[in-house]
Amino acid sequence: MSTHNNSPKEKPVDMNNISEKLDVVNNAPEKPAGANHIPEKLAEMTSSEWIAEYWKGINRGNDVPCCCPRKMTSADKKFSVFGKGYLMRSMQKDD
């Protein structure tokens, strides 16, 4: 007898099945106002360009580059110190 209760809502997602992943993304609840939004990664962008665009937005105090102004928190400022090294390394080795 299994003690695991798999309700239909909490079915594990098969990460190899694209349509299941899309269902999870498309059916996700709306984020509350002011929640961090991650910019779209355009097809022609490399990962490095996308990360750089994301960081530009954070450094300007925005959730999304050029949109949704938000005051930078101390956590953002502390994280940026660590994140910049990772960003520089990823830009050097990426596509």
From Swiss-Prot:
Pfam families: UK. InterPro entries: ASFV_DP96R. The keyword Transmembrane helix does not apply. GO terms for biological process: symbiont-mediated suppression of host cytoplasmic pattern recognition receptor signaling pathway via inhibition of TBK1 activity; symbiont-mediated suppression of host NF-kappaB cascade; symbiont-mediated suppression of host toll-like receptor signaling pathway. Keywords: Host-virus interaction, Inhibition of host innate immune response by virus, Inhibition of host NF-kappa-B by virus, Inhibition of host TBK1 by virus, Inhibition of host TLR pathway by virus, Viral immunoevasion. Inhibits cGAS-STING-mediated type I IFN expression and NF-kB activation by inhibiting TBK1 and IKBKB/IKKB. Inhibits host TBK1 phosphorylation. Belongs to the asfivirus DP96R family. This is TBK1 inhibitor DP96R. It comes from African swine fever virus (isolate Tick/South Africa/Pretoriuskop Pr4/1996).
